[in-house]
From Swiss-Prot:
Region (Disordered): 1-58
Mode of membrane association: Multi-pass membrane protein
Keywords tagged on the record: Ion transport, Membrane, Mitochondrion, Mitochondrion outer membrane, Porin, Protein transport, Transmembrane, Transmembrane beta strand, Transport
Family: Belongs to the Tom40 family.
Lineage: Eukaryota, Metazoa, Chordata, Craniata, Vertebrata
Function: Channel-forming protein essential for import of protein precursors into mitochondria.
Top-level taxon in the UniProt lineage: Eukaryota
The protein's assembly and partners: Forms part of the preprotein translocase complex of the outer mitochondrial membrane (TOM complex). Interacts with mitochondrial targeting sequences.
Protein name: Mitochondrial import receptor subunit TOM40 homolog
Comp. bias regions, Pro residues: 10-21
Molecular-function annotations in GO: porin activity; protein transmembrane transporter activity
A family per Pfam: Porin_3
CDD domains in alphabetical order: Porin3_Tom40
PANTHER family associated with the record: MITOCHONDRIAL IMPORT RECEPTOR SUBUNIT TOM40
Length: 336
């Protein structure tokens, strides 16, 4: 929910996980007592452990469960990644399909020198251009320690199709975000999305989403409320709104096995569905297996196999729709 563009592009890794508290020998505001036997005063300052964590973003509420489900594959796909420097990388992707159109994509990623963590550096520029001239591009930058902004553009051949501007503010125990999509002052159209997520306790986070859209002859607002409870090895999330309901449950059985259940109900489509997915990770064998089955009797599975010391990753996927008696499979190879 809240995604204005249909274009997909990689997002920065681990952007939604809350920062771990720093390890300090003495809590902030305290000094070592000069002699033994002294006890802290009742009006001591709040320690790092007493503070509520940042809950992440609203869009990441269901992500942990949805990442367990396999991505549908069809045809043959070859991807070649090449790092030109520590900051710049390009990739070439060729897809051959029996159902859709075969295509070629050229992608480029630039990561700046503003290091904020082991896996985060800004600004980030991501672009993808296909053989028809259509472009998907994103620019992500950490303006301050709390404010992050993103600009996304999508063109179809020589015409602008979509563009959006995101601004996100992360406080100590809350995250607020505003997205403006396809604004047109002359026509009087556009989409405005506002998100807010607040940590109530270390385990419970509550928030909401407000979507306002306007175009000639049509104007409307859709509101949704969300709650997420996080335990040491499971997470439950529920979103309720005028558009329907969305609930997910994620459970980590052990270091190798993770399972998830997803429920979706749409008031517009008058349809409900339940999906079950799991992920099996075997690091010693360099294998990653994902499987799923839903209430529409669609069964799918993907298998990824890394071939060290070569920079190769093999991927195979198969999906069977029992109701429509339709089967499709795919094979992928990633180099680099």
């Amino acid at each position: 929910m809240g995604n204005v563009l249909a274009a997909s592009s990689p997002a920065p890794p681990a952007a939604g996980s809350p920062p771990a508290p720093g390890l300090v020998s003495v809590p902030p505001g305290f000094t070592m007592p000069p002699v033994a036997g002294l006890t802290p005063t009742p009006d001591k300052k709040e320690t790092q452990e007493d503070r509520l964590p940042n809950p992440g973003t609203f869009e990441e509420c269901h992500r942990k469960c949805k990442e367990l489900f396999p991505i549908q594959m069809e045809g043959v796909k070859l991807t070649v990644n090449k790092g030109l420097s520590n900051y710049f990388q390009v990739n070439h992707t060729v897809s051959l399909s029996m159902i859709g159109e075969s295509n070629y994509h050229f992608g480029a990623t630039y990561v700046g020198t503003k290091q904020l963590g082991p896996a985060e550096a800004f600004p980030v520029l991501v672009g993808d251009l296909d053989n028809s001239g259509s472009l998907n591009a994103q620019i992500i930058h950490q303006v301050t320690s709390n404010v992050r902004s993103k600009i996304a553009l999508q063109t179809q051949q020589s015409k602008f199709v979509n563009w959006q501007l995101d601004t996100e503010y992360r406080g100590e125990d809350f995250t607020a975000a505003v997205t403006l999509g396809n604004p047109d002052i002359l026509v009087g159209s556009g989409i405005l999305v506002a998100h807010y997520l607040q940590s109530i306790t270390p385990s419970l986070a509550l928030g909401g989403e407000l979507v306002y859209h306007r175009r000639p002859g049509e104007e409307g607002t859709v509101m949704s409320l969300a709650g997420r409870y996080t335990a040491p090895n499971w997470t439950a999330t529920l979103t309720l709104g005028q558009a329907g309901a969305h609930a997910t449950y994620y459970h980590k059985a052990n270091d190798q096995l993770q399972v998830g259940v997803e429920f979706e109900a749409s008031t517009r489509m008058q349809d409900t569905s339940v999906s079950f997915g799991y992920q099996l990770d075997l690091p010693k064998a360099n294998l990653l297996f994902k499987g799923s089955v839903d209430s529409n009797w669609i069964v799918g599975a993907t298998l990824e196999k890394k071939l060290p010391p070569l920079p190769l990753t093999l991927a195979m996927g198969a999906f069977l729709n029992h109701k429509k008696n339709k089967f499709q499979c795919g094979f992928g190879l990633t180099i680099g």
